[in-house]
């Protein structure tokens, strides 16, 4: 993970990989995940899809793990979270996909936005422009959103016997590496909650 710390482009790749992992695993997604080594090819598409549904949609007799920030932070009210996220996206003119139709507080949407901020930072540095606005935005977004609900999400995910449980620590490490790079003074993810 150390190679990620000083490289916003690598951080973006990490966020996009995690976004792929936590996206619905249709046949095409499963192929991409296995080709990139993100999922063991021994785990068939059908099995991965069943694992996804059991973990995030139906529970399979257990409580599901929500992929939505607003459902992981009910004390704040989902409407307020959605409005704040939309303001973040709108400020940077980031458009939500018309095809996916995911809510702004979906884990994948938040991961993709952080990847976009990292890529904007990388482009600014490459082009000799000020990258600090993108760093500040990423720091603020992490503090207000992903890092704020990730501990509870991870706790619940890692308590499942799902194939997805293995990705909780990797996602946590990615976020911590990014926060460390940004000089974050907030508590570590394990200290939150």
Curated annotation (Swiss-Prot):
The keyword Iron-sulfur does not apply. Pfam families: Nitrate_red_del. The keyword Transmembrane does not apply. It is found in: Cytoplasm. Keywords: Chaperone, Cytoplasm. InterPro entries: DMSO/NO3_reduct_chaperone, DMSO_Rdtase_II_chaperone, TorD-like_sf, TorD/DmsD_chaperones. One of its GO terms (cellular component) is cytoplasm. It comes from the Bacteria. Its main location: cytoplasm. Coiled coil: none annotated. May function as a system-specific chaperone protein essential for the assembly of an active selenate reductase SerABC. Belongs to the type II DMSO reductase enzyme chaperone family. This is Selenate reductase assembly chaperone protein. It comes from Thauera selenatis. The lineage of its organism: Bacteria, Pseudomonadati, Pseudomonadota, Betaproteobacteria, Rhodocyclales. The gene is serD.
